[in-house]
Amino acid sequence: MALLQPARIRILAIGKLKRAWVAEGVAFYRKRLPGLEVVELKDSTPAKEAEAIRAARKPAERLVLLSEEGRQLSSVGLAELLGGWASERLALVIGGADGHDPTLKQQADVLLSLSELTFPHELARLMLVEQLYRASTILQGGPYHRS
């Protein structure tokens, strides 16, 4: 299984981080994932957010939307999925409060869900960067993840 390459991954996130503790948590994991890029896009209607996501996405990026109806994976399953995509560029997209526009969902390569629970998008961003770090350590055989 190939190692995770954070420089090939971009998180496209609707909205800014407003809570300092969330921003600190995201920064903590980003330091451990050199090259991981986070692009913040303006809150709007789902249709306008979809336009902004399409404009921000690079042509060669696989479009992965985080969505409540997406596929749920274990941390090991996510690591395996990301390891299989190690040579590809990824755009992991966190939508706004009203979710993703249906047309964007149709264009997505994959829909993933962090949980059956609903989270504020700020918290989803923190959980996503932590899971990316966890996936990286799983693929490297590091001690962070305990099965």
Swiss-Prot record:
Cited InterPro entries: Alpha/beta_knot_MTases, RlmH-like, tRNA_m1G_MTases_N
Organism: Synechococcus sp. (strain RCC307)
GO cellular component, one term: cytoplasm
Highest taxon of the lineage: Bacteria
EC number in record: 2.1.1.177
Residues bound to S-adenosyl-L-methionine: L66, G95, L114, S115, E116, L117, T118, F119
Record carries keyword rRNA processing: yes
Keyword line: Cytoplasm, Methyltransferase, rRNA processing, S-adenosyl-L-methionine, Transferase
GO MF: rRNA (pseudouridine-N3-)-methyltransferase activity
Annotated Pfam families: SPOUT_MTase
Quaternary structure and partners: Homodimer.
Family of this protein: Belongs to the RNA methyltransferase RlmH family.
Subcellular location: Cytoplasm
Position of the signal peptide: none
Main location: cytoplasm
Listed SUPFAM superfamilies: alpha/beta knot
Reaction(s) catalysed by this chain's protein: pseudouridine(1915) in 23S rRNA + S-adenosyl-L-methionine = N(3)-methylpseudouridine(1915) in 23S rRNA + S-adenosyl-L-homocysteine + H(+)
Role of this protein: Specifically methylates the pseudouridine at position 1915 (m3Psi1915) in 23S rRNA.
The keyword Iron is annotated on this UniProt entry: no
Protein name per the record: Ribosomal RNA large subunit methyltransferase H
Gene: rlmH
